[in-house]
Amino acid sequence: MYRPSVTALILVFAAVANSWLFLSKVLPTITSRAPPGYQSIYTPAKNTSSVAWTIMLNDDPVGSALSVVEPGPFGTISVWSNLQLDDLPLNELLPPWASTMLGTDARKLRSSIKLDAFGYMTINRNGELQEFQSIVKVPGVRQAVHLSGTITPDNKVTVSLRSGDFEYETSRQLPNNFSIRDELSPQATMAGISQGQRWTVPIYSPLRPTRKPIEILYASVAGHEVLYFNNQLVNTHIVSYRTAPNDHQPPRSRMWIGPRGEVLRHESTILGSKLLFLRRPVNDTLSSDNKLSHIKSLFEKADGFSAISSQVKQ
C-alpha cells in the first residue's frame, strides 16, 4: 500500500500524466502561414480510428498509450485514451511547485509509482473542445483521482480536481481562440506544415500555484530526418518548441511529422528527463472498433467513470 501522502501526490502528477489541463492560445504567426490548430489534430471522421504509442523515459521503456477517435452526430467526435505507466521516477519528474501544493517535501515521498490514466473528451464539428474528463488510478491506492472540465460558448473554462476528501475547482474566462492543448502526451497528426514555418503558443496551467501561469513557447519547422517506421524509411519534418525565439537554445519539445501529417515521434524534456512517445505501426489483428470497445470496458471498470459510460450509451 502507498502512504496517504502519495495519494495527494497523484493529484499533481495527474496533470502531467494525462495533461488535459494545459490551455494554449495560438497567437498571430511570425510568418504568413497559420499555425496548426485543432482542425489539423482532430477533424470530423466517418470511421473509428486509433493510435498506439510506446513511452520511453531517458531511453528506458516505462509504459504505453492508446487513443481512439470515435465519430459522433453532427460532425462531433469523442476521443478516448488510456495511458499505462510503470515505475515512474517521481523525484525526477515532479515540478518545483509540487512541494508547495502538497505541503510537504516531495523528495520524501515514494521514489517511483505505477498508474493508469483514462481520458475522454468531446470536440465539436469546428474542432473546439467542449468537455473533458480524466481518471488516474494507482495500484494499491483505493481512491482514484478525477479531473473534469467544461468550456462554455463564451469561453469560460471550469476545471475540477477531486480525490477522496480533497476537492479543488477553478474557473477562468479565456480570450477568443483559446483551446485545450495536450502538451506532454502525443498528438496523432499535424497536417499542413512546411519548412520555415513559425508560430507562438502560450501554455497556461490553471492548477499551477504561481502568479505567472502562462509560458510562451516558440514553434518552428526546421530540419528533416529519416526514420525507420513500419518496416520502411520515412522522411519527416521536425517541429521544435523552444522557450526563446532563437534557434540556439535546445528545444523543450520536438515532433517528427511524416509526409501525410502523421506524428511518428514526440519528444519532451521534463526537468532534465527525456520523455519520448514512439508511434506503433497499425496492428491489423485488432480493429479500431475492437480497440474502442476494449478501452470503454476499461473506463467502466475505473471508479467513477459510470457517468461517462451512461452518457455514451444514450
Regions found by a protein language model. Give the residues of each.
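Acidic, serine/threonine-rich low-complexity disordered tracts
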Residues: 2-155, 161-172, 192-314
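Short helix-loop boundary/capping segments
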Residues: 167-189
